[in-house]
Amino acid sequence: VLALVAALAAAGCGGEVSVPKTERTEHAGAVLFNQRCSGCHSLDAANAYGSRPTGNRYLKYSERTNGPNFNQRKEKRDDVLFAIRNGGFSGAIMPANVVVGRDARLIADFVSRYSGGSGSEAARAKQR
């Protein structure tokens, strides 16, 4: 199990996040999301593309580790914290307490602000 968690965490390491460093809390949450969550979840603001990579001709179906795509799904802070603490909502493959304490709160703040497609902070920023 630890090997799986380590592999998923390593797979999540991507490039630069698009959240400005001037937004310290959200930027820190985006970096943590990229490092710890992007192996299974997608969210453009964190440069995270773990929910079935688009355009991959070799990957016809979603993988078991694919979590929700937060570009399409809006989340509330308390729901994100619940999912982090309990390993998601459905008892799926997400490990419980994948991050804890301040890191969990930073990720929850970031996801609650930037998730949700056209209603998200990221989408509004692109329109400016």
Label for each model-derived stretch:
Residues V1-L2:
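Bacterial N-terminal signal peptides that target proteins for export
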Residues V5-A6:
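Gram-negative bacterial Sec-dependent N-terminal signal peptides
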Residues A9-G12:
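C-terminal motif of bacterial Sec signal peptides marking the signal peptidase cleavage site
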Residues V17-T25, A30-N69, N86-I93, R113-A123:
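Periplasmic/extracellular electron-transfer cofactor-ligation site
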Residues G67, R77, L81-I84, A104, ...:
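Extracytoplasmic/secreted envelope proteins and their assembly/folding machinery
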Residues Q72-R73:
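Short, surface-exposed ligand-recognition loops at beta-strand->loop->(often short) alpha-helix junctions
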Residues R77, L81-G91, P95-N97:
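Extended amphipathic secondary-structure runs
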Residues A96-R128:
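C-terminal capping alpha-helices of c-type cytochrome domains
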